[in-house]
Amino acid sequence: MCKAFCSCYSYHYHHREKMGIKEYYDKLAKSYDKLYKNKYMRIVEREIIQKEIKDGDFVLDIGCGTGEQLKILNNAVGLDISLEMAKIAKNKTNKPVVVANAEFLPFKNKSFDKAISFFGALNHCNLKRALREVNRVLKDDGIFIFTVANIYDIKWIIKNILKGNFKKVKNAMKKRKGTITKVIDGEKIKVKTRFYDFKEVEDALKKEGFEVVYTFGTNITNSPLDKFIYKSFLKNFASYIGFVAKKVKNR
């Protein structure tokens, strides 16, 4: 396992990491598991993991957070920009966790069979740069499974329209950007986030040396139904849009 690393695999910072994102998740870490309980989204994520990841695959979990997916992977390394998140993931899973930026992965070329990134990590970075780095560290024909926030999240759109937040919806649609706000121990914390659609991500994948195997959606209805419809046309209105992409050989 250690051959994959450019240097020591324990808590490793890159000099260009985005400090605002790091600080947000450092403060959020202790409350993260309580705030983000979505068992139906996790069920779909794990369904795909079990389908696509085989015994013996060496897996990189980008934006592993507190280790929810990392703990079910047999042979894996976690990566997160937040030291506090990484500490929790390390304690929860007893697996190696690297603290680093997804845009600058501290691993050697062609180190991993598969990579995953669910929920939040890729919403805060330069997606093309992150895809380029994932392509670099994956072996030929390696698979990258990931989700990003959907610009056409119907539940979010309806919720904000009903609240009268028309300007918020309009700005999000136009700029494809937004802000996540939480209150932790009486302190309001914020982080910028990005929204995507299927075509934008598919184009980026193609440009960075991937071919799309299939797409899916998570948190469509936030109910048991999601397990049966995550590949249907309803994925276009999910909270998160997902991709299973294969690295093109000799990239």
Curated annotation (Swiss-Prot):
Keywords: Methyltransferase, Transferase
BP-aspect Gene Ontology terms: methylation
Top-level lineage group: Archaea
Classification via InterPro entries: Methyltransf_11, Methyltransf_Superfamily, SAM-dependent_MTases_sf
Pfam families the UniProt entry points to: Methyltransf_11
Gene Ontology MF terms in the entry: methyltransferase activity; S-adenosylmethionine-dependent methyltransferase activity
PANTHER family attached to this UniProt entry: METHYLTRANSFERASE (PTHR42912), METHYLTRANSFERASE DOMAIN-CONTAINING PROTEIN (PTHR42912:SF80)
Family of the protein in this entry: To M.jannaschii MJ0638 and MJ1123 and M.tuberculosis Rv2003c.
UniProt name for this protein: Uncharacterized protein MJ1252
